[in-house]
Amino acid sequence: MSVYSLKELAEHIGATSRGNTDVVVDSIAPLDKAQANQLTFISNAKFRPFLAQSQAGILVVSEADIEFCSANSNLLITKNPYVAYALLAQYMDTTPKAASDIASTAVIASSAKLGTNVSIGANAVIEDGVELGDNVVIGAGCFIGKNTKIGANTQLWANVSIYHEVQIGSDCLIQSGAVIGGDGFGYANERGQWIKIPQTGSVIIGNHVEIGACTCIDRGALDSTVIEDNVIIDNLCQIAHNVHIGTGTAVAGGVIMAGSLTVGRYCQIGGASVINGHMEICDQAIVTGMSMILRPITEPGIYSSGIPAQTNKEWRKTAALTLDIDKMNKRLKALEKKLAD
């Protein structure tokens, strides 16, 4: 197991240090559980009372946190401890790669082009015309369809399916079970019979994109579905055909986006939200969890819908009242008219 000194970690993230710069840690743990061989951090002032009692070998803190620490504590001092934690977690990460070499059971078309240091796991299928950049990692059981291109340093965990002619940028991470480039939900109806419309567009994914487990991103009907750079999409999301998601947007688990939706840059979409298609959401919009967005959002801000959980008794009363809203509205208008007369 690797160990990391206070001096090394401070230099890595550009932080200042206090205490024994030779002290070493081998992992990261929560504030209340960290031991002498571990690093921990504080990102919320409400936890300051616990700093003095921490047994951690290294504490990552802000200037404002220092007075709450023991005089003997070894400190990494930074403006944003949570960002520092993220950077240190990457530096100390022990997660194995999805594959470490090219497995003998991988099926790789002779026309596929592989960059240097590519790894492909057992039983993966790489079809004709595929291009894999340097240091790409393809996990066991993945399927990469014809003429798909995947940029350098991108990693796919086991059992990811990438259909034909998809483009994926560099430094992306795609979790197990994701399906990218499957058919969009396109049909015409003729006297009750559904007629399938072939989806001849593609999916274009930018750089530094992360896609969660079992998320589906459908290919476009004619044009492409587009996911711009630095987008993060959680597990179990449905991104329909011709959706366009702007740079830096975050999409939490279980979100459903209908076809031809355009989501702006640096938006945050809360979990289990449902968003109508053929409309736009502006840059920097925040949608809270379980919202149903049926109309365009044109101004940055926080948007919500839905009824927060209540006791069953309270909810039944609320539901009953909603049935009477129309009657109450008519009575109110009648009273207003009577008063006006």
Swiss-Prot record:
Which pathway does this polypeptide act in? Answer: Bacterial outer membrane biogenesis; LPS lipid A biosynthesis
Which catalysed reactions does the entry list for this protein? a UDP-3-O-[(3R)-3-hydroxyacyl]-alpha-D-glucosamine + a (3R)-hydroxyacyl-[ACP] = a UDP-2-N,3-O-bis[(3R)-3-hydroxyacyl]-alpha-D-glucosamine + holo-[ACP] + H(+)
Known SUPFAM superfamilies for this protein?
A: Trimeric LpxA-like enzymes
Provide the E.C. number(s) assigned to this enzyme.
2.3.1.191
From the Swiss-Prot or TrEMBL record, what is one GO molecular function term?
A: N-acyltransferase activity
Statement: the UniProt record of this protein carries the keyword Repressor = no
From what superkingdom does this record's organism come? Bacteria
Q: Which residues form the signal peptide?
A: none
Enzyme's top EC category: transferase
Similarity field? Belongs to the transferase hexapeptide repeat family. LpxD subfamily.
Q: What does this protein do?
A: Catalyzes the N-acylation of UDP-3-O-acylglucosamine using 3-hydroxyacyl-ACP as the acyl donor. Is involved in the biosynthesis of lipid A, a phosphorylated glycolipid that anchors the lipopolysaccharide to the outer membrane of the cell.
Its quaternary organisation is:
Homotrimer.
Q: What is this protein called?
A: UDP-3-O-acylglucosamine N-acyltransferase
Per the record, the gene is: lpxD
